[in-house]
C-alpha cells in the first residue's frame, strides 16, 4: 500500500483548501493519473481533475506532486505524494481555470499577423527559430513554476514569452513583437531555467525565446534597459562588467606558463572577490595542481548575451579564445561564466574543456585528509550551475566529505535567488523580492553559513540576508570552506 494526499477545494463550498489522505494498493510504474482514478473508484472521492490523451501530448493533466509540476499521465506516483493543482485559479480540486490565460492570448494578438495575400513561401533556414517553439502543449507547467510570476505582475511569464517569440521569429509575421515583449516584462526573466526544467516538451524558453527576443529588441531599439547599457559601456571600455576597485586578482598573482590547467576568473573574482581566487590556488595546490591564471582574459560575455546586446560578444569571445587556448582544462568558479563558456562559446566556434571547480574536485576530494570544520551549513544551487550545466551532486559530495560539517538542504532546492538574467541591475525590485524569499528559507534552517559557487549569487544572498536581519549568517564560496578544511592554522 502507498499513501497519497490530495489537496481538495471547491470554491463557494469549502472555506479553504485542505488535504485528504488516501491509502491505495501499490502497482509497479503506477502513474499519478492512475492513482487519482483508483482513489475515486475505491473511496468514491469524486476528485475533480482533467485528462485526455494519456500520452503526454495534450497537457490537460498537469498537476503538482510534492511541489513540482508534472503531467499526471507520465509521472510515477510516489509513496507519501502530495498532489495539488497548478498555480492557477481553482475550479474544483485539481481542475483549474485557464480562461484568464486564453483571454490574454487573444488580447495580445498572439496569432500570425500579416497583410500578405495568397500562399507565402518560407525557407527552411528561416523557419528554424520559430520551429523550436511550436511544441508547446499548453500544460502551463512553466507558468506554475516560474519564480518571477509569483513576485511581479509586470511579467507575463514564460508561456507568453514563448508565444510572442514564436511569431517574432516567423518571417511572415508583421507585428512589432519585440516591443510587445518588452511591454509584457521581457526583461523581468532571471533566465533561471526552471521553466525549461519542468517543460514536458523540453522547450528552452530562456535560451530559444527570451534571450533571442531580447536580442531582437536591442536591434530594433526597444531594448535593453538603461542599466544594461551602462554595463555594456563598462565592458567595452574595461573588459569587465564591474568597476575596478583596488588591485585585481589577476595582476596580483604571477603567471605559471607550464601548467595545463587555466583558471578563468570571471569579473567579480578578479575585481571584487580575490579571496575566492586565492582559495582556489591553495586548494588545488593541496591536490598537487599548479594552476595558471592567464593574462588577457576578459568578461565572458554572459551579461551581454542574457540581455541581448550581442554586438560586442564576438570580440569578447575572440579575446578569451586567445587567452585560454592551449590549456587542457579551464576551471571556473562562477556559474554564469561556466555556462557561457560551455554552452554559448561553441556557437561562436570556440570549444574549450571547461569544468566547474566542483566537477574538478568531486572525484579527488577523498585524496585529501581534512581537519574538522564544525559548522552547520546549507547550499544554494546557482541556476546557471544546476540547470545551466547540470551540476548538482558534485557540490553535495564535497560538502558531505568535510569532517565536522553539518549539511542541511533548503526547503526548495534550486530556488532562484534573483540575481541573474540582468534582473539584479535592470529590475532590482524583483531581485530583492526573490532574495527575500531565499533569505526566509535560510532563516528556517538556523545555519552558520550558506555555501554556493557563484559570485553573483553570493553577493546577492549576502545583501538579502542583511536586509532581513540575518547578517550574522556567512555566505561563502565552496572553495573558502575547503580552504578552512585544508588549512593547518
UniProtKB/Swiss-Prot annotation:
One of its GO terms (biological process) is tricarboxylic acid cycle. NCBIfam families: dhsB, PRK06259.1. [4Fe-4S] cluster 1 binds at residues 136, 139, 142, 146. One of its GO terms (cellular component) is cytoplasm. Optimum temperature is 75 degrees Celsius. Its cofactor is [2Fe-2S] cluster; [4Fe-4S] cluster. It catalyses: coenzyme B + coenzyme M + fumarate = coenzyme M-coenzyme B heterodisulfide + succinate. The keyword Ribosomal protein does not apply. GO terms for molecular function: 2 iron, 2 sulfur cluster binding; 4 iron, 4 sulfur cluster binding; electron transfer activity; iron-sulfur cluster binding; metal ion binding; oxidoreductase activity, acting on the CH-CH group of donors. Its EC number is 1.3.4.1. The gene is tfrB. This is Fumarate reductase (CoM/CoB) subunit B.
